[in-house]
Amino acid sequence: MAWRANLACLIKAGGRTRWFPLPEYLSMSPVLHNTCSRRKSTAPEKLAASVAACDTNGKEPGTALGRLYSPEQQASILHVLNTASDKELEAFRLLRGRKSVNIVEHRKKFGPFQSLESLIGVPLIQYKTAVEVCNSILCPENRRRKKSQEKWVLRKFIKPGVEKERLKAVNSIVSIVFGTRRIAWAHLDRKPTVLDWQQAECWKLTNKTYPSSFYLEEISSVVSKIPKADLYILEKSGLSIQNTSLFPILLHFLITEAMLYALLNKTFAKDGQHRVLSINRNAVGKHFDLMIGDTRTSGRELVKQFLSESVLKEQPRVFFPRELAVQYRQKIVKSSHRIEELYDSLLQAVAFYELVFGSGSELKC
């Protein structure tokens, strides 16, 4: 739990000064931020007069607890305290064991809780515990777990780490996938609508060693054709360095990735903000159920399905401009060779949006 020292209560009682930190929750009433905030110069007499003293058991006066929550939040908390059984109360971590039984017994003996302050009268529950109990009722553990799992998914599969708020603020992205012969990209807005989708032939990887200047010239030429976007998403290959036979291909991928990071991150030196991110290739494969063991299968049929749905469905998973949907489909059908980079660039863009905004299929980790 996060604590903020500037939200502390200093209370003068019986010649002793006591400090009570208050937890900060976004869902709480704004009143929380003003609770007990006093200037250091406030006279002790006035401070003591304005806030009641704590008793010897460390229990805070009831009125302080009520000021932390809005009337709606108090009503929600009281509803749980007055209607839940002891087993249901145990779902909240701090009420496991004897505390949940004490709440039910207190309710039977004295009637329903009329205010949050009366919670402090329950045995084993003091002010600090009461605050944590109220917070856990407002923000159940499963909701916190879902949020932390969501952050874990983004941290694990999208690198470098970027705040989710910033990811959600993007208006468009360019998804880039490169192979041994070509670089493909898909430009999508957040609807998501395909704004641009194409590829460029760059090289045919052979045993020949290419100088760095060759990579710079080839990739710079491609970058000049790529549309501007808020973020650029690159595919992170799953090739292992342990497989020595694939080392030339892995080296080629790493050089290409480094070049794209440098050429597309044009403002990084000024603001330190990453505009180029990498997403794990197999994570996208799992998102669309394209994995067979550790091997990712072709996304060709899935892309054809997206194209068909964009014409037939009112709310397709991906939107294509009508004049381009037929053109793209014909290109895929007529292609004599597999253009996997083109398929993968689109799937990667869709997976990115669905992971960030939580729509579509859930990632199977």
UniProtKB/Swiss-Prot annotation:
Pfam name, any one: HHH_3
GO function terms (MF aspect): DNA polymerase processivity factor activity; nucleic acid binding; transcription elongation factor activity
Main location: mitochondrion
Subcellular location: Mitochondrion matrix; Mitochondrion matrix, Mitochondrion nucleoid
Transit peptide residue numbers: 1-40
A Gene Ontology cellular-component term: mitochondrial matrix
GO BP annotations listed: mitochondrial transcription; positive regulation of mitochondrial transcription; regulation of oxidative phosphorylation; transcription elongation by mitochondrial RNA polymerase
InterPro entries referenced in this protein's UniProt entry, alphabetically: RNaseH_sf (IPR036397), RuvA_2-like (IPR010994), TEFM (IPR039150)
Keyword terms, alphabetized: Mitochondrion, Mitochondrion nucleoid, Transcription, Transcription regulation, Transit peptide
Function: Transcription elongation factor which increases mitochondrial RNA polymerase processivity. Regulates transcription of the mitochondrial genome, including genes important for the oxidative phosphorylation machinery.
Assembly behavior: Interacts with POLRMT.
Similarity comment: family membership: Belongs to the TEFM family.
Protein name, as recorded: Transcription elongation factor, mitochondrial
Species per Swiss-Prot/TrEMBL record: Rattus norvegicus
